[in-house]
Amino acid sequence: MLQAFQHRRWSLVLLWILIVAAIIAAPAVLPVFRLNLLGRFLSLAIVALGIDLIWGFTGLLSLGQGIFFALGGYAMAMYLQLNSSADLPNGIPEFFSLYGVDRLPGFWEPFHSPVFTLIAIWLIPAVLAAVLGNLVFRNRIKGVYFSILTQAALLVFFNFFNGQQKLINGTNGLKTDVTQLFGQMVGSPEMQRGFFWLTAVVVILALSLIHISEPTRRY
């Protein structure tokens, strides 16, 4: 049994070495399009880690994990919209004119700041998760009821966001195909590699935090 455990341990070590080697080699061997695609897969891996944490260690299947990912995405999208709208006559995103809105809604204003945006990307989902988690676990909701509740929460948020045409463009979503970000050309190979490395580092940090956190160390 001990030998089997050691074999499994070394197999995992070898697997991690191969994964890290592939990540390091990817920017050198992949074209920009493929690298961008791999970066998107890695960002979705962060969501998968969240599902793995709560399902694998507590047995609770969350069907609403996309809520928190989407909130962070909307925060970044709002900054990108404002960044790309700076040269417009009224200085607000184009979609507002479709609904007769001629002034930027107040809650959009802080997203002119990249610092505020980066904080909001982490803080808004965390606060919502804390509130929902407190309500769920205080009432000891578990099993299939937990899954149904999280799926219902996802549908509530989905319908709410889709209905906010005048505020966040509803079903059409927010345009994020900007040409510049933080003064750099988004489409340049250097920026694409930077995005990839940033995403890879966040995935590794998230995985490391899961493994060193107190609840998971018991396993």
Where on the chain are the PLM-derived regions?
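Transmembrane alpha-helices and adjacent helix-loop boundaries
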Residues: M1-R218
